[in-house]
Swiss-Prot record:
Source organism of the structure: Xenopus laevis (African clawed frog)
A single MF term (Gene Ontology): methyltransferase activity
Official protein name in the record: tRNA wybutosine-synthesizing protein 3 homolog
Region: Disordered, residue numbers: 1-23, 209-251
PANTHER family per UniProt: TRNA WYBUTOSINE-SYNTHESIZING PROTEIN 3 (PTHR48418:SF1)
The keyword Transcription belongs to this UniProt entry's keyword annotation: no
Taxonomic classification: Eukaryota, Metazoa, Chordata, Craniata, Vertebrata
Origin: domain of life: Eukaryota
Length: 251
């Protein structure tokens, strides 16, 4: 009971939090999926990204890698064009990297079996790198992840390292990965919807069977009490009649 109360508290806290992502809202391609998950009592999402092509300008030394030392030159959650990359490179001053980052979703789960259901759905949808972690405070997080990312350096110290033809090839490759990513998201949503429906049906069936069993037990108890009452009456009648029989047998 304490775990359920703690989970409910965490879910309420999450619902009140402001979205601190750069975009400030859930990505369009996964809005429906995030809504479906958050409608369930046993789940709530903590972070998400539908997948993106991003060009990052890293202005840092080789000894450290810190997120705050990176600037975004370009980002899109849709298909991109080579011209988008060429335009972004005009502002390059450091080491520029082109990345494709696939769909990622973190979901806090009420119980381990709830996380296992979500994990099974993710694996079947093609997100093979998905996993479950349990924190020190009992927080169960299910991460939906895959490995079909892409990361390629384009410049070093502001100098372009690759040809225009290669950049066009990279954009084509990133777009193919984005299309596959969207297919997996669609598959994940469909599998999740079916799995939740199946769970609800099993739960309803179990509840009905338990209710029916309780009614059956109550009926049996009433019948047993009735039988005992009838037996008691017969025994009383038999006991009362015994003296009369004895009297009739006296000489």
């Amino acid at each position: 009971m304490e775990k359920q109360e703690a989970f409910s508290h965490w879910k309420q806290q999450s619902a009140r939090k402001t979205d601190v992502s750069k975009k400030g809202s859930v990505d369009e391609d996964i809005e429906e999926t995030v809504r479906l998950i958050n409608q369930q009592e046993r789940y709530f999402t903590t972070s998400s990204c539908s997948g993106r092509v991003i060009i990052i300008n890293e202005t840092l030394d080789n000894s450290t890698i810190q997120k705050q030392n990176c600037s975004w030159l370009f980002v899109t959650h849709k298909l991109c064009k080579p011209d988008d990359v060429f335009a972004a490179l005009q502002n390059a001053t450091g080491d520029v990297v082109l990345k494709f980052e696939p769909f990622v979703l973190h979901v806090q789960c009420r119980a381990l079996e709830d996380a296992q259901l979500l994990h099974s759905v993710a694996i079947n949808a093609g997100f093979r790198n998905s996993g479950i972690t349990v924190g020190k405070k009992g927080k169960i997080i299910m991460a939906v992840r895959s490995t079909h990312g892409l990361e390629v350096p384009l410049t070093q110290n502001g100098k372009c390292l690759v040809s225009h033809e290669y950049i066009e090839f990279l954009v084509h490759t990133a777009n193919k990965k984005m299309e596959e990513n969207k297919r997996r998201i669609t598959r994940f949503h469909s599998c999740l919807h079916k799995a939740l429906q199946k769970e609800d049906c099993v739960h309803d069936k179990t509840s009905k069977e338990q209710a029916s069993s309780c009614v059956y037990v109550r009926r049996r108890k009433r019948k047993d009490r009735s039988r005992k009452s009838n037996c008691s009456s017969s025994e009383e009648e038999h006991t009362d009649s015994e003296p009369e029989l004895t009297l009739f047998n006296d000489p």
